[in-house]
Amino acid sequence: MARHGPPWSRLDAQQERDVRELVRGVAGLQDEADPNFQLALNFAWSNFRFHRFLDVNSHKIEKTIEGIYEKFVIHSDLSKAASWKRLTEEFLNAPLPSIKEIKTDAHYSILSLLLCLSDSPSNSSYVETPRNKEVEKKDDFDWGKYLMEDEEMDIGPYMDTPNWSEESEEENDQQPLSREDSGIQVDRTPLEEQDQNRKLDPCISWKDEPDDRSWLEHHVVHQYWTARPSQFPHSLHLHSNLAAVWDQHLYSSDPLYVPDDRVLVTETQVIRETLWLLSGVKKLFIFQLIDGKVTVRNNIIVTHLTHSCLRSVLEQIAAYGQVVFRLQEFIDEVMGHSSESMLPGSGSVPKKSTEAPFRTYQAFMWALYKYFISFKEELAEIEKCIINNDTTITLAIVVDKLAPRLSQLKVLHKVFSTGVAEVPPDTRNVVRASHLLNTLYKAILEYDNVGEASEQTVSLLFSLWVETVRPYLQTVDEWIVHGHLWDGAREFIIQRNKNVPVNHRDFWYATYTLYSVSEKTENEEKMSDNASASSGSDQGPSSRQHTMVSFLKPVLKQIIMAGKSMQLLKNLQCAESTTCQAGARDAERKSLYTLFLESVQSRLRHGEDSTPQVLTEQQATKENLMKMQSIAESHLELDDVHDPLLAINFARMYLEQSDFHEKFAGGDVCVDRSSESVTCQTFELTLRSCLYPHIDKQYLDCCGNLMQTLKKDYRLVEYLQAMRNFFLMEGGDTMYDFYTSIFDKIREKETWQNVSFLNVQLQEAVGQRYPEDSSRLSISFENVDTAKKKLPVHILDGLTLSYKVPWPVDIVISLECQKIYNQVFLLLLQIKWAKYSLDVLLFGELVSTAEKPRLKEGLIHEQDTVAQFGPQKEPVRQQIHRMFLLRVKLMHFVNSLHNYIMTRILHSTGLEFQHQVEEAKDLDQLIKIHYRYLSTIHDRCLLREKVSFVKEAIMKVLNLALMFADGWQAGLGTWRMESIEKMESDFKNCHMFLVTILNKAVCRGSFPHLESLALSLMAGMEQS
């Protein structure tokens, strides 16, 4: 069924035809009566009428255009960037055929369509095609001839010959001699510009030959570059003839003097070539570039200067031109980095053609490039003054005006030579980047020490450093904020070890490597960042100091901790809401570099706002100076010293000290004398107040978040408590059930080394009170040396308790930590074994074993037995009594040792450890606290090799206790008086030795924690 038209027939016929043509072109349907054609037509009209797309956003389009422009600049496509910028601006500022306004929605809609159709504009090659604008056709109709058609005029005999033909031919003949003689205005002299503007000027009369010649003489530069010898023009001014007078003097003083052929130039020409040289132009006449060195042509002379004087001035300028060429060469190489280019100072060894300069060199190049832009603008202003001829400009005036710039060029060349050119070609990028940043940093500090005389130089170096340090700060920001250490060129001093994944237990120790260079050997070394971060301020021997990026030294530990913490946080499974909130915060976040610049600017503004305060401070300082001067004079007069200058200096010194204390007493450093001197006088304070606080804040945030996550989501504190409960036996009831079952087996002389039996006993004991830890605990037994097995105290050697710690808690509770825990666990087990063996002995057992022989003899031999046992009854009782006393002494010793370790060492140290864990700011600090805690209990339990003799004495006493318990259990009949006496003697010697050693240690004050043990053992010795 055919339709006659759309329901909204108010639309004009032109749109109707366009839509139908669109359907034919896209769908390929030609018959309008076709139902498919009508469906497509209705669909098209519906989308036009009720479209779903938004109106164009002009701000978004301009932001996209600016982003593409910056991308072209970053990719060093400067020609594409310039074309893109110019063409888009021309289009936006040009009216459309049906719209007279500019920058309308139609303009931005067309640009939006083109941007949507574009595909990676930075990767496509583009050469701008010249666009010839249509020029309005001039009216060639000869109105004069038409109007004067019937008039009779005497035109002269040469009416057919144009009166300008001969001059035009002469002008055309001279044009090939023109040259590219300006670095600021390359292809056109001022004459040509003015001549183009005056082509249709009716005031120029070509018939009047003298006027034409004078005009040409005033506006066309004499071709001094043809190197033709010129005659000295004579002037009535004596100073203008100095060169001729000097030549005449030389000729009169030396009859054989023959003047060389020289080219006479004007001072203006010398000035302009000087400006062109400093702007980077290489093809000059007065200055020649030969084998990369700028030299001055020897035959140049001006009328008012001698040849030697002019040459000395120009040679100084040539030296600065050489600096400009060297720096410009570096800029071109970094921008282009073609296969033939080499970095300065690389000699004959070229760099790899595929390796682009790393970002620090690119940032340094960009800083130099921006400096030269402002420098060339200043040179262009001077040349405009010369062209306009408004003021008198001489070579001396130009050199004096450029003196600050020339001194800056000297400083830039020194920094460039030290930081870039003198670096060997095979040096790693990390060393190149750190060396360049250190060179700038040291140069700022060096010129900063000079004071106000070098404020401009320090300001220049500071701006250069701020631009050069941008990639480093961006790398730091990306790492400590997002957890990604992106460093493709490997120029950052910290490198990621990709072989260790994040979820590995060695991630915290072996993931990152800190590169440093020894100043003396210049050899690259690798240090683990764990060592550097854990050592804190300890830098090792003073003879071997390592250099790195100097400005990052105060916050290097915070950067490493924040970066590793953030990467660990990113890999932990956090809640989605937290991730969304972090993403929203990151969208509003400013980068570290931006925050640093804003802080510096606010510091500068604060210095500008404090100008009225400075005046009052100066007045107060003057008054204080007068007071202090009078006081100093009175003190000096007492010593018969009359020196007013010395008094003034003393007074000024006291004032500076008081001013220093006033500034730094409150902790808020504010040294803002002027806006210029803020960065000059206090560069390190500027870093301390503008950069370091932002790094510290991010360090506290991400490390605090990591600690909170580990404590709450991953139960770090609970796992630490579990290690103390089982390894240090703070879970007393649980571990008592476990080790008493083993001790009973040993007392009954039964086999107890079976691993299955040990694990069953451990699971039964732990499962009752700590069911969540029973699956993580296990115990194993390894056979020890047979020599140790002979001693009862070493029968427990080989027992090893294991606790499965999940990731990431195993970063804190590592396998090395569990080894230390096991050493303390074994010592506690040995002490408890001795204590248990003595505790279970009963007095009745020993008495009953003494009476058994009498009961066994029977009544038959009663008289003989009584006769024999009667005289021996008293020695047996004495033997029993001595064994009772020895048991009490051993129990006192073992109980004193047990109480000392369980209360004074483990419990007190554990309370300190819990408090330190709560206050730990980062994971590295927590690891150190845990290691320090283990080291403390390891030392205080006398397990260190240095005090092994004390431990041997204690082990000997424990061994005596176990042997005594075995003998007690065997019965009195197995004892002899000699063995009891020997055991008493051994115990007394060990007891005396330990008391003496411990008392000396306590008196020295080196081991205050041993005081309680020493007093307890002394009490036992007094009882004996």
From Swiss-Prot:
Similarity field: Belongs to the TUBGCP family.
An example Gene Ontology biological process: mitotic cell cycle
GO molecular function: gamma-tubulin binding; microtubule binding
Native source organism of the sequence: Homo sapiens (Human)
Compositional bias per record (Basic and acidic residues), positions renumbered to this chain: 189-203
The protein's name in its UniProt record: Gamma-tubulin complex component 5
Cystine residue pairs: none
Subunit structure: Component of the gamma-tubulin ring complex (gTuRC) consisting of TUBGCP2, TUBGCP3, TUBGCP4, TUBGCP5 and TUBGCP6 and gamma-tubulin TUBG1 or TUBG2. TUBGCP2, TUBGCP3, TUBGCP4, TUBGCP5 and TUBGCP6 assemble in a 5:5:2:1:1 stoichiometry; each is associated with a gamma-tubulin, thereby arranging 14 gamma-tubulins in a helical manner. Gamma-tubulin at the first position is blocked by TUBGCP3 at the last position, allowing 13 protafilaments to grow into a microtubule.
Domain of life, source organism: Eukaryota
Subcellular location, record wording: Cytoplasm, Cytoskeleton, Microtubule organizing center, Centrosome
Protein purpose: Component of the gamma-tubulin ring complex (gTuRC) which mediates microtubule nucleation. The gTuRC regulates the minus-end nucleation of alpha-beta tubulin heterodimers that grow into microtubule protafilaments, a critical step in centrosome duplication and spindle formation.
Low complexity bias (residue ranges): 531-543
Gene that this polypeptide is encoded by: TUBGCP5
UniProt keyword terms in alphabetical order: Cytoplasm, Cytoskeleton, Microtubule
Keyword Metal-binding: no
Region (Disordered) location: 155-203, 521-545
